[in-house]
């Protein structure tokens, strides 16, 4: 929240808003840390794929580590640089979930639970990226990344509106960015 909220938006949260932030972070961390740990790429997005004569190659894997089972699918379908239609995201997540279950990847047996995990993981990534992109602009003089922030701020807003545990985050984002009409799937 230091780079995006304080620096980019020039906002200092009051005590209530800080409490909302702390509640939101706790809800996200509780979800993410409860997930099974598997080997994850950590930067699994279209920009890191290359088609070769032998098949698909994955680039930029030096940061791979053990992390939440939803990390890579959240990275791919909640890309900071590409917007996917929500029905496409649901379809791809269902396909991933079905195949992962068949090969024994430790994911929830209930799809709605897995989708929630994917959304919370995507939310954590986008909150982090908002701060990183603001930092790249203000500290490193790289303003081009800020052009992509509306996309993942919208991801954050959309996900926060879907889950009661994230309603404090919804209020923070609406206060920070202005409010919008609610549209989308609910679980």
Could you say what each language-model-derived stretch is?
Residues 107-116:
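Histidine/acidic-rich helix-loop-helix segments that form or flank divalent-metal centers
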Residues 131-187:
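ATP/Mg2+ or Mg2+-diphosphate-binding catalytic cores
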Residues 44:
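Hydrophobic HxD+1 residue recognition
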Residues 2-8, 69-106, 120-140, 152-159:
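Active-site activation/catalytic loop segments of kinase-like enzymes and analogous catalytic loops
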Residues 1-41, 50-53, 57-59, 67, ...:
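ATP-dependent phospho-/nucleotidyl transfer catalytic cores
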């Amino acid at each position: 929240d230091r780079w995006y909220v304080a620096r980019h938006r020039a906002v200092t949260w009051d005590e209530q808003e800080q409490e909302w932030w702390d509640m939101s972070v706790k809800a996200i961390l509780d979800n993410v840390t409860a997930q099974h740990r598997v080997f994850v790429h950590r930067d699994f997005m279209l920009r890191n794929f290359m088609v070769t004569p032998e098949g698909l190659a994955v680039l930029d894997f030096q940061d791979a580590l053990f992390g939440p089972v939803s990390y890579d699918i959240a990275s791919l379908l909640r890309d900071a640089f590409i917007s996917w239609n929500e029905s496409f995201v649901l379809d791809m997540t269902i396909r991933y979930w079905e195949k992962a279950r068949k090969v024994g990847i430790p994911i929830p047996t209930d799809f709605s639970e897995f989708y929630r995990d994917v959304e919370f993981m995507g939310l954590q990534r986008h909150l982090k990226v908002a701060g990183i992109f603001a930092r790249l602009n203000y500290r490193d003089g790289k303003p081009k990344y800020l052009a992509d922030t509306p996309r993942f701020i919208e991801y954050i807003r959309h996900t926060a509106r879907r889950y009661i545990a994230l309603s404090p985050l919804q209020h923070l984002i609406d206060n920070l960015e202005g409010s919008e009409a609610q549209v989308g799937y609910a679980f």
